């Protein structure tokens, strides 16, 4: 089973130490009571991966690991088989010892849109809410972060993260915990909090913004990336049964409305940093994620609309500060 002892020891003497009052019992209960029916299969794949330590590791321009001399073709094939047992791979890409994991999302493109607008991450302790496979955690480490903590209740993503970590030499600067934001105490201990691709899945978006705020230190920075619609500060889309085939989409505000929400929740220095239409080059079906993707979620005759007739996905990045 996945052990979290390294993380507990890591935070024991720092600002996250109060978390130890609740976290170990919480994760022990998760291991006993909440494991997915496929978890053992997924974790078995992780255990059968080789423990590799790269001679070249690039987390600045991507997530890339190489070894000299290179691993054998047989080792690479065995590694690929174990990683394919963890499909679908949604967030990436990863390049590992000559094997490229071509994920559904080009998460590196999102990072390129976000990075120019945020405060330097060097030396910072960071929380990434809804972190998926942990791709962006590694990019945060590549920018010099002291510690990057991701939370995501999806257990496949936890196994994907642990697989990548094992192939990166067991790097302890990034960690993923199988939790939702609502399961965290009000730590007020992170220098930066990222919430990317989460807000529209929340039934109560303002509660989510308060939860994010409660994790930040004073003067800490929130990086919020989410779906938006065009319009003024009063414009909010509340989809019906589905949006782009997703059932769990509740509120899609305009960027000005989202700015107003953040200000209502007490954030300051709120700015709309970026807006970008999601394309079928950024989100698409691949050999590592073979089910339907964005192309199937858009109107086949008019890609400016979803199949339900709503505006096609438009994503905004907002930056805000906790006073």
Swiss-Prot record:
Entry keywords, A to Z: Transferase, tRNA processing
Gene Ontology BP term (one): tRNA wobble uridine modification
Catalytic activity from the UniProt record: carboxy-S-adenosyl-L-methionine + 5-hydroxyuridine(34) in tRNA = 5-carboxymethoxyuridine(34) in tRNA + S-adenosyl-L-homocysteine + H(+)
A single GO molecular function term of this UniProt record: transferase activity, transferring alkyl or aryl (other than methyl) groups
EC number: 2.5.1.-
Protein residues bound to carboxy-S-adenosyl-L-methionine: 91, 105, 110, 130, 181-182, 196, 200, 315
Enzyme superclass (EC): transferase
Summary of subunit composition and partner proteins: Homotetramer.
Family: Belongs to the class I-like SAM-binding methyltransferase superfamily. CmoB family.
Function statement: Catalyzes carboxymethyl transfer from carboxy-S-adenosyl-L-methionine (Cx-SAM) to 5-hydroxyuridine (ho5U) to form 5-carboxymethoxyuridine (cmo5U) at position 34 in tRNAs.
Name recorded for this polypeptide: tRNA U34 carboxymethyltransferase
Organism of origin: Yersinia pseudotuberculosis serotype O:1b (strain IP 31758)
Gene behind the chain: cmoB
């Amino acid at each position: 089973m996945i052990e979290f002892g390294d993380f507990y020891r890591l935070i024991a003497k720092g600002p996250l130490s109060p978390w130890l009052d609740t976290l170990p019992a919480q994760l022990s209960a998760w291991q006993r009571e909440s494991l997915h029916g496929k978890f053992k299969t997924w974790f078995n794949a992780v255990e059968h991966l080789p423990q590799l330590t790269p001679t070249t590791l690039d987390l600045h321009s991507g997530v890339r690991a190489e070894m000299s001399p290179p691993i054998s073709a047989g080792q690479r094939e065995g590694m690929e088989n174990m990683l394919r047992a963890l499909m679908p791979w949604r967030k990436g890409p990863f390049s590992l010892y000559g094997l490229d994991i071509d994920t559904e999302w080009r998460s590196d493109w999102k990072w390129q849109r976000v990075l120019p607008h945020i405060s330097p991450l060097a030396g910072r302790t960071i929380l990434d809410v809804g972190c998926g496979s942990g791709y962006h955690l590694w990019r945060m480490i590549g920018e010099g972060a002291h510690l990057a903590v991701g939370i995501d209740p999806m257990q496949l993503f936890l196994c994907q993260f642990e697989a990548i970590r094992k192939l990166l030499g067991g790097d302890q600067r990034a960690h993923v915990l199988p939790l939702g934001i609502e399961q965290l105490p009000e730590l007020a201990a992170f220098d930066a909090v990222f919430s990317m691709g989460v807000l529209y899945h929340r039934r109560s978006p303002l509660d989510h913004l308060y939860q994010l705020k409660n994790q930040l230190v004073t003067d800490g920075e929130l990086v919020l990336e989410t779906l938006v619609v065009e319009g003024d500060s009063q414009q909010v889309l509340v989809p019906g049964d589905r949006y782009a085939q997703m059932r769990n989409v509740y509120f899609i505000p305009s960027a000005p409305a989202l700015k107003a929400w953040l200000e209502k929740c007490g954030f300051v220095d709120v700015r709309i940093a970026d807006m970008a239409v999601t394309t079928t080059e950024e989100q698409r079906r691949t050999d590592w994620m073979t089910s339907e993707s964005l192309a199937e979620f858009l109107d086949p005759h008019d890609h400016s609309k979803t199949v339900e007739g709503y505006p096609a996905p438009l994503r905004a990045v907002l930056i805000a500060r906790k006073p």
